[in-house]
Amino acid sequence: MNSDILLFISFLVVYFVLPTTVKSQNLVKNSGFEVSYNLPEYWIITGPVISMQPQTAVDEQIRFEGKHSLKMESNNPNCHGRAVQTIDIKGNQTWFFKTRFRVKEVKSIDKSVLIRIKWFNGDKNIGYNYVYEIAGESDGWFLATNKIKPVTEATSAEISLEFRWSTGTIWWDDISMEPCPDEPARNVKVGTFHFRPPGPTVEKNVSLMGKLLDEAGAAGCGIVCLGEGWPTCNTNIGMKKHEANSIGGSASKMMAEKAKKYRMYIVSGLYNWDNDTLYNIAVLYNRQGNIQDIYKKVQLPDSETEAGAVPGNTFPVFITDFGKIGILICYDNFYPEVARNLALNGAEILFNPIWGDIRGTDSDVEKTIARSRAIDNGVYFVNSIYDGNTLIINPAGEILQETNKQGTLITATIDLNYNPPWDWVGNAGRGVWKDIWKKDRRVDLYGNPIKYDSPVLDKDKKDK
């Protein structure tokens, strides 16, 4: 494992495992339901419709720690009940929330287990967050955590532990909400090229792309995106067998050298023959100049299948030293499921080497689609296009940089912790969409994302 990935893992440990350097101060009263007489003190048991509430009581038999847990049990598939507690907070303070829960005969945790924190200014509901980071633990218990920055004007928070739309049983225990340090910015300078290699030879294309990579390196880019199948563009070679159409060819070697020289990640489209099997791929070169990983294009148009190309079958998400990225190639972007699977698997930036998109009658159709992919999934979106506009877009769908000028590099310094609340997302006030869509998504209907197993690369190409 290389030093860049170790650095990112160290960040995750500090961010998630060691969330506080502030003195521990749990604001939740009766956090383990120890002070209880059938129903827990300081908690209000309620729900939208009284007759639809699950049976709720303190349980002495099953608990995470201490003597008690809170048990909600239902034989009504349309049940909806809550345990609610309101605490006083400071709106300019970041908070670390956690709770443990376990379930029995509940079909979908995503659908039926909801942890919501509403923010109030006086009696006015001014926003909310979902707690959606859930990890399995031993003995059947789950740990739900989030590091949350409330709406600035908030003076109190309503913690709501909810069981809804299912039969079965849920137990709650070990709830806490404590002040913690603010999230540090996670800045990275991203770059992308609007460049259709002119040919007529691979050598000329490689030389010109090398000069553009020198420009990106001099600009201090942390990662840069290149176009689809660029080495053989305008050469009459296309996807045919050729040294340039391989991860060991001249174009790939040049990119590896530039990545190492400038300690810069490179995302590049490439055609790749593996013996007699042809793939349309995107390669991620790391800062050491090694091929870190490869994405194989999933959605192939007829022109590529007729050339003999074979599709990939997974949606990989790659860990860099600044965050997680996903890649989709050209026709992949015509299908919203590709971007959605990458986002569900954790991608924070989507890179898109793309020839073009000429659907519809609007000449700016690719802008609309690219902005939609960013907004729908709460991610940054960066393309490198031949026919259209090369774009850098933030999770709010705002175009940070764009160009359609041949041979141009555009850059933007982005913060991967950018996670703004939006008005009228969900059912009340302001919501953080990046959190909300992952929780409200009906996984019981749509299914889980397709998981990814990293391919085994040749030993000399894999990070040491």
Placement of each model-derived feature along the sequence:
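Residue-level detector of high-confidence beta-strand sites
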Residues: 128-129, 281, 293-296, 352, ...
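Extracellular and organelle-lumenal recognition/adhesion modules and their flexible linkers in secreted
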Residues: 23-189
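Short beta-strand segments enriched in small/hydrophobic residues
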Residues: 185-199, 203
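C-terminal beta-strand edge segments of enzyme domains
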Residues: 139-142, 147, 384-464
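Bacterial Sec-dependent N-terminal signal peptides
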Residues: 1-25
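Cys-nucleophile CN-hydrolase/nitrilase-fold catalytic domain and related Cys-dependent amidase chemistry
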Residues: 214-287, 359-371, 376-377
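Active-site catalytic loop in hydrolytic enzyme cores
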Residues: 273-348, 358-361, 368-372, 425-427
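CN hydrolase (nitrilase-like) catalytic-core segments centered on the catalytic cysteine
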Residues: 245-267, 330-411
